[in-house]
């Protein structure tokens, strides 16, 4: 009899987004006339930049000629893409990152989970609360936690609350932890970390031999000057941090699939016998064994992001979604609903009005406004009493959704 991975049985019933989809489908079936506006899952809506489309079309044509046909690509991704990434995303910000330290992949979500393949099972892991559910669930699947308690918190994880009181930036752990997940700009709260805050984390990690897993998927949305876009802008980060990036939310690649992970060659981890091993070699071995790379066509599209035209077009996309976020923030504030985020991130973190729970507010929005958000409690117990709205939508949908919410919640009185 084949045995299953019993750790999957510890997962809370239903991943957050499938549960949202289930409720929305049930409502849509019962009310087929309803025009539902989905502002929950952070999927982009606007077309791929023209520069990317043109590059991909050209690459398709190359695949039709024997002389320019490409088969399996390099395990880390093509050098021309990695060079462009290193030059534009890191070296331009005085980050000491080389193209050889970049691994191209088909998604930062995948990499955030797959990185656990090279880490041991006895690490103490710290996550913020609320948090992107993938960080938690992949550790549960890998057997790094015990069961969940009645609050949905897993034994073995160290939860670091991020609240309005601490400006949605967690304090350093009071105990020693081995692995730390940080996401800035933050999903779901939209908060950013100052240089000083990140320096504190880097100093902590170096003092305790900890590893920071830094998710920078939304760095392109940072508008405030002086806010770091990369953990490697912080002195000492090369010795303690891995960074995840994605083209999904910057260049609209959610359906095209391209991302990258940075593993500095100076980064070390400890083996069971006490020896030190460089994580770059482990990650290279893992990727070479389990991943065949991103398609040549998609990598050419990603390379075009760094062209002059591509940079202008991507900036246009980012500004479009940030304007959506501004509209959401402004309209909700005008009817007395407290909001956070949406300035340096495409997400607006909404305080539920009238003492409603996260799921109660979700259901009220769905049933009375025909608008879908993401319940804050789905991101962790500290997210209870909040709901995330995504700016990834058409301008018409955002304006209509805010009109509907405004008509229902005028004078909600949730300003804090």
UniProtKB/Swiss-Prot annotation:
It catalyses: (2S,6S)-2,6-diaminopimelate + 2-oxoglutarate = (S)-2,3,4,5-tetrahydrodipicolinate + L-glutamate + H2O + H(+). GO terms for molecular function: L,L-diaminopimelate aminotransferase activity; pyridoxal phosphate binding. The modification N6-(pyridoxal phosphate)lysine is found at residue 249. Keywords: Aminotransferase, Pyridoxal phosphate, Transferase. Its cofactor is pyridoxal 5'-phosphate. Its EC number is 2.6.1.83. Belongs to the class-I pyridoxal-phosphate-dependent aminotransferase family. LL-diaminopimelate aminotransferase subfamily. Involved in the synthesis of meso-diaminopimelate (m-DAP or DL-DAP), required for both lysine and peptidoglycan biosynthesis. Catalyzes the direct conversion of tetrahydrodipicolinate to LL-diaminopimelate. Pyridoxal 5'-phosphate binds at residues 72, 108-109, 132, 187, 218, 246-248, 257, 292. It holds the Pfam family Aminotran_1_2. Homodimer. This is LL-diaminopimelate aminotransferase. It is an enzyme of class 2 (transferase). Pathway: Amino-acid biosynthesis; L-lysine biosynthesis via DAP pathway; LL-2,6-diaminopimelate from (S)-tetrahydrodipicolinate (aminotransferase route): step 1/1. The gene is dapL. It comes from Synechococcus sp. (strain JA-2-3B'a(2-13)) (Cyanobacteria bacterium Yellowstone B-Prime). Substrate binds at residues 15, 42, 109, 132, 187, 292, 388. One of its GO terms (biological process) is lysine biosynthetic process via diaminopimelate, diaminopimelate-aminotransferase pathway.
């Amino acid at each position: 009899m084949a045995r299953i991975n019993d750790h999957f049985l510890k997962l809370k019933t239903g991943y957050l987004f499938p549960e949202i989809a289930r409720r929305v489908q049930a409502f849509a079936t019962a009310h087929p006339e309803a025009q539902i506006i989905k502002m929950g899952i952070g999927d982009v809506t606007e077309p791929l930049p023209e520069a990317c489309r043109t590059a991909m079309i050209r690459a398709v044509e190359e695949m039709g000629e024997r002389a320019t046909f490409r088969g399996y690509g390099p395990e880390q991704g093509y050098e021309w893409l990695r060079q462009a990434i290193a030059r534009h995303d890191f070296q331009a910000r005085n980050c000491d990152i080389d193209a050889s330290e970049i691994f191209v992949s088909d998604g930062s979500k995948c990499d955030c989970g797959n990185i656990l393949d090279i880490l041991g099972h006895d690490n103490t892991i710290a996550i913020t609360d609320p948090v992107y559910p993938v960080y938690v669930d992949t550790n549960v699947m890998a057997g790094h936690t015990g069961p969940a308690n009645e609050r949905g918190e897993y034994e073995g994880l160290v939860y670091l609350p991020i609240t309005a009181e601490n400006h949605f930036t967690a304090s350093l752990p009071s105990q020693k932890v081995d692995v730390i997940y940080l996401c800035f700009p933050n999903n779901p709260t939209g908060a950013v970390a100052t240089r000083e805050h990140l320096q504190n984390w880097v100093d902590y990690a170096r003092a305790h031999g900890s590893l920071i897993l830094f998710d920078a998927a939304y760095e392109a949305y940072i508008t405030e000057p002086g806010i770091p876009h990369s953990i490697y802008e912080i002195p000492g980060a090369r010795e303690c941090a891995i960074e995840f990036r994605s083209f999904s939310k910057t260049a609209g690649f959610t359906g095209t699939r391209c991302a990258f992970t940075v593993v500095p060659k100076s980064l070390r981890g400890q083996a069971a016998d006490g020896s030190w091993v460089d994580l770059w070699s482990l990650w290279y071995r893992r990727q070479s064994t389990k991943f065949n790379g991103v398609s040549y066509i998609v990598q050419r599209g990603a390379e075009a992001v760094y062209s002059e035209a591509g940079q202008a077009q991507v900036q246009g996309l980012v500004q479009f979604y940030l304007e959506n976020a501004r509209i959401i923030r402004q309209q909700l504030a005008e009817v007395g609903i407290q909001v956070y985020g949406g300035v340096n991130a495409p997400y607006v973190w909404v305080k539920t009005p009238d003492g409603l729970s996260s799921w109660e507010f979700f259901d009220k929005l769905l049933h009375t406004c025909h608008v879908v958000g993401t319940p804050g409690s789905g991101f962790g117990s500290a997210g209870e009493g909040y709901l995330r709205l995504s700016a990834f939508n058409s301008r018409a949908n955002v304006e209509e959704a805010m009109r509907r919410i405004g008509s229902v919640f005028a004078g909600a009185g949730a300003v804090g």
